[in-house]
Amino acid sequence: MKNLLLGLILTLLGAQGAFAQNASAEQEIRNLSQEKWQWMSDKNVDELGNLFHEKAVFVHMGGSWGTKQELDIIESGGIWYKKADIHEVSVNIIDDTAILLNRIDLLAEVGGNEVTNPFEVTEVYVKQGDSWKLGSLSFTRLLSRPEE
């Protein structure tokens, strides 16, 4: 009976530790996403280059491309992510992969024209060693803005 009770206690403590680690990873991803929006606004391609995985994919309304093209577009101002008003964020951790969903209104300058669009943005992060790398960033334009 003692062994059973001890096993149950150790299992519960292990589950609590796993939950705490997961909550910590979720907060780390939320913070990283927030920093990413600021770096994109600032056109900080050095920080973004460290964050983006070399094989990352970026899906926009106008097409999809890889890391080098995304960094070139940001640096040149082809797309200037001026401000992301974030309304909702959710994070799901699956092993060494984090999937973050943002519901945002994005103020951007595209080809010299300033536009604001509602998006559901999917960010996929992969844990490599001690750091997270962005593996995918996809913008899905929403047809209507959900009620707050």
Q: What are these model-predicted stretches?
A:
Residues 5-6, 39:
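Intrinsically disordered, low-complexity repeat segments enriched in small/polar residues
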